[in-house]
């Protein structure tokens, strides 16, 4: 999770990459961090559901990880004039992926939607994992083909990544002898496909399809690297604790910071690097503080409920 959120942060910042391949992977393809996040989320949800298959209990645990953080932030942004009334209501109730909005908080809406579907899907999935995955991918592909707006396709096709996370969690549990090396050439093909889009459509890549090939192999490769280089494991684990809060905060904070500093200086390469790095650090500190405040309030409410 830590690596995924760093990738997303770089994508949403404005780092002045001078090396083309670095700009391509870290900036132009940075939206892949979301797909990595979704893949890892469904991977973890598979095991969470195995431990607790009761629908109500499962949903309660999932919602408590999202709503206490997303709802106050939506209210804060609305009060500071960053959202209209309609945008606030859509974001607050997690309806962004169903109703056209500014898409800033589409991930919250998407993950809530997937939480609701997960227990239902896994009941079918457990009967025949391979067939369920293929049928799910086919169904999502048909639905995306019929959608009227490409913006919706960009969101809903990510369900495929989510389904792959379930399948690889199943392989990890029941087929530990599964050979991972074939995923490397598949990942390379995905990068080639992505570079093709990059070459023909420019720096802004609106395509999600190549990450279906990239993400499984990339996650396994990064897991292997992190396991070998233990010095980076703890920092990434620590960052991973605050990924959702960082997601809620970082875009608006980046925009405000860059707007303020651009009034004082004309951006240059060293200055741009400093400002963007400062933005990421500030957003991360703000995410830690925000999470601790909300967690403290939740704990107070729990204690009062017990006393009552």
Protein language model features and the residues they cover:
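Membrane-proximal cytoplasmic C-terminal regulatory module of class A 7TM GPCRs
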Residues: 294-308
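Alpha-helical transmembrane segments of multi-pass membrane proteins
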Residues: 6-17, 82
């Amino acid at each position: 999770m830590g690596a995924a959120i760093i990738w997303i942060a770089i994508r949403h910042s404005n780092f002045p990459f001078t090396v083309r391949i670095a700009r391509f992977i870290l900036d132009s393809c940075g939206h892949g961090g979301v797909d990595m996040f979704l893949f890892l989320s469904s991977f973890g949800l598979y095991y969470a559901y195995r431990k607790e298959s009761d629908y109500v209990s499962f949903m309660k645990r999932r919602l408590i990880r999202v709503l206490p953080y997303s709802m106050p932030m939506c209210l804060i942004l609305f009060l500071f004039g960053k959202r209209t009334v309609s945008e606030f209501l859509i974001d607050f109730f997690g309806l962004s992926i169903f109703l056209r909005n500014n898409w800033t908080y589409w991930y919250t809406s998407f993950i809530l939607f997937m939480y609701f579907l997960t227990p239902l899907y896994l009941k079918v999935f457990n009967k025949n994992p391979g067939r369920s995955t293929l049928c799910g991918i086919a169904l999502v592909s048909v639905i995306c083909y019929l959608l009227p707006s490409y913006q919706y396709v960009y969101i809903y096709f990510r369900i495929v990544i989510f389904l792959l996370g379930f399948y690889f969690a199943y392989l990890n549990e029941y087929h530990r002898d599964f050979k991972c090396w074939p995923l490397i050439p598949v990942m390379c093909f995905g990068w080639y496909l992505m570079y093709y889009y990059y070459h023909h459509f420019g720096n802004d890549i609106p395509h999600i399809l190549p990450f279906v090939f990239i993400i499984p192999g990339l996650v396994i490769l990064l897991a292997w690297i992190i396991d070998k280089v233990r010095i980076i494991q703890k920092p990434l684990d620590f960052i991973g604790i605050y990924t959702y809060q960082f997601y809620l905060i970082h875009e608006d904070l980046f925009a405000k910071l860059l707007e303020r500093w651009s009034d004082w200086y004309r951006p240059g390469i060293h200055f741009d690097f400093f400002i963007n790095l400062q933005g990421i650090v500030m957003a991360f500190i703000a995410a830690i503080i925000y999470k601790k405040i909300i967690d403290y309030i939740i704990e107070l409410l729990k204690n009062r409920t017990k006393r009552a």
